[in-house]
Amino acid sequence: LNGLVFFAPVALLVRTLAGVSEHIFFLLQALLSGVIFLGEIPTGFITDKIGYRKSLIWAQVLLFGARSLLLAAFVSRSLALFVVEAVVEGIAVCFTSGTGSAYLYALYGENGYLAKTAHAGNFGTAGFIISTVAYAGIYKISGMEGLLITTVVANAAAFACSFFLRS
């Protein structure tokens, strides 16, 4: 469900329509990259303490929060919320980085890992394709706000599903 990012084809446009300049957009992307760079090791230590499943749930909580913040930032045209969204999304990425693969390896072992990783990757690709194709229809019906709302709803579903991950 994380592949369902309905605003992805127009990520720059989402922010510029809310008053963010292209220059600031790229600074926000740099902030996101910086948070990921700085957060990889600390979140890895946290994952070692709390386990893969809980880290993946935290990642979903944070990603849902980031998408909700993006919607709020767009509606309110708030640069501060765009900044917070970039930080929260960066932390979410840190919690997912490598954790999904490690979770699958721990769950299925060497024999089942490759097939399950390919299966998970295929779902991500399918989600990306579905959201890219659906983008035009959603945009025509409900505009940019509709794209963001649909993404938040998809992330809410992913968040709910994360609680059903096996231990």
Predicted regions located by residue number:
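C-terminal ends and interior cores of transmembrane alpha-helices
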Residues: 61-77
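Cytoplasmic membrane-interface "Motif A"-like loop-to-helix N-cap segments
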Residues: 49-60
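Helix-loop boundary and gating motifs at the non-cytosolic
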Residues: 1-38
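Paired small-residue
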Residues: 80-88
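Symmetry-related core transmembrane helices of the 12-TM Major Facilitator Superfamily/SLC fold
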Residues: 146-164
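Cytoplasmic helix-loop-helix junction between adjacent transmembrane helices
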Residues: 87-124
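Residue-level signature of mid-helix packing/kink "hotspots" within the transmembrane helices
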Residues: 33-41, 128-133
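Transmembrane alpha-helix termini and helix-breaking/packing motifs in multi-pass membrane transporters
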Residues: 128-151
